[in-house]
Each structure stands twice: as structure tokens, then as C-alpha cells.
């Protein structure tokens, strides 16, 4: 039986009770994607992007939860941790449900990154490969079977997704820093 008070389930309940059919995973992916693309952490800009995905202006309770989610993401991306926590169903949810949420998270991330990335031609080969991986992962949600191998594959992909955003964030953060002035050789 799924744990009803998981962060994912709590957010899903909040969204559903407010009339939003968007997955918490897709919303979290959107937030991380836009943050990793260099959109910054302006709450109003995040709420505008979220409202577009939600297809309506969020009510105060959803709005407050979205701001809290952004604060969590900000502390993860700017802190000392080397992974982020993904807003996904608990491990006791069926694998098909978790895999679908993983795909939705990737789709949200790619949307957020794509809408906010200033110049993708400046990304390293490694960063470009991460984005390609995310696109591929977003398509494989039906390929995982309820089995030990399927579970192992899911966990491997999830662990990858916990570190991949940090690479993209550090890369776009570097692009925002102007090059240091070269000392003159007089």
C-alpha cells in the first residue's frame, strides 16, 4: 500500500484538489530545468512559468507550495550537496507509475531548460549529451517491466537524474560569469 503522506503524493493531492491535472514530477522537472538553464530564482517568474503549465493562475495554497518548492531547489543547486531530490512517487508505487513520473519529470525539465536557455550552442558536449539522455529517458517510460531488472534500470536512471541537473546548472552558471580581465604585461 502506497504511503499517502509522501511529498509527491501530498503535492499531487494539492494539485488535484485545486483542479490541476499536472503531475508533480513534471512541475518539479520544469522548475529544475528552468533553474539549470540560468533563469535564476525569481519567484514571480517561476510562478508565471508554472501557471502556463498549470493552464491557470495557481490558488494561494498552490502558489505557496510552488514557492516552497523553488526554495528547496535553490538550496539544492546552490548548496554543497552533489545530488538533487527528485519529486517522484515512493519506491512502493508500481514501477509503471514511477517510470511514467520519471518520463514526465524529464519532459518538464526539457521544457523548462528549452524555454530559458539563452544559447545552447555554448553548452559543452557533456551537457548536450545530458539533454539528449533526458530526451531519451522521457520516451522509455513504457519500456520498464515489473521485474528485478526493470527495478534496477529504474534506480540507475533515477540516480543519474539526481546528478545530471547539477552539471547543467554549473555549466550555465559559468556562462553567466564574465571572463576575468587579463593582467597587462607592462
Curated annotation (Swiss-Prot):
Pfam families membership: UPF0149
The organism's place on the tree of life at top rank: Bacteria
GO cellular component: cytosol
Xref: HAMAP family: UPF0149
Family as reported in the entry's similarity comment: Belongs to the UPF0149 family.
PANTHER family, alphabetized: UPF0149 PROTEIN YGFB
Protein name per UniProt: UPF0149 protein Pfl01_5435
Annotated organism of origin: Pseudomonas fluorescens (strain Pf0-1)
Amino acid at each position: 500500500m502506497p504511503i499517502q503522506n509522501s511529498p509527491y503524493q501530498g503535492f499531487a493531492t494539492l494539485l488535484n484538489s485545486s483542479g490541476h491535472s499536472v503531475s508533480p514530477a513534471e512541475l518539479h522537472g520544469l522548475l529544475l530545468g528552468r533553474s539549470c538553464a540560468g533563469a535564476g530564482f525569481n519567484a514571480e517568474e517561476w510562478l508565471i512559468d508554472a501557471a502556463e503549465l498549470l493552464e491557470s493562475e495557481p490558488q494561494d495554497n498552490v502558489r505557496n507550495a510552488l514557492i516552497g518548492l523553488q526554495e528547496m531547489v535553490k538550496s539544492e543547486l546552490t548548496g554543497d550537496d552533489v545530488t538533487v531530490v527528485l519529486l517522484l512517487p515512493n519506491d512502493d508505487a508500481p514501477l509503471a507509475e514511477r517510470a511514467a513520473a520519471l518520463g514526465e519529470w524529464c519532459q518538464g525539465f526539457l521544457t523548462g531548460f528549452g524555454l530559458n536557455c539563452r544559447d545552447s550552442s555554448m553548452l559543452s558536449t557533456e551537457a548536450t549529451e545530458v539533454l539528449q539522455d533526458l530526451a531519451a529517458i522521457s520516451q522509455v517510460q513504457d519500456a520498464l517491466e515489473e521485474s528485478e531488472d526493470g527495478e534496477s534500470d529504474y534506480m540507475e536512471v533515477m540516480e543519474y537524474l539526481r546528478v545530471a541537473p547539477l552539471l547543467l546548472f554549473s555549466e550555465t552558471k559559468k556562462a553567466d560569469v564574465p571572463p576575468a580581465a587579463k593582467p597587462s604585461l607592462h
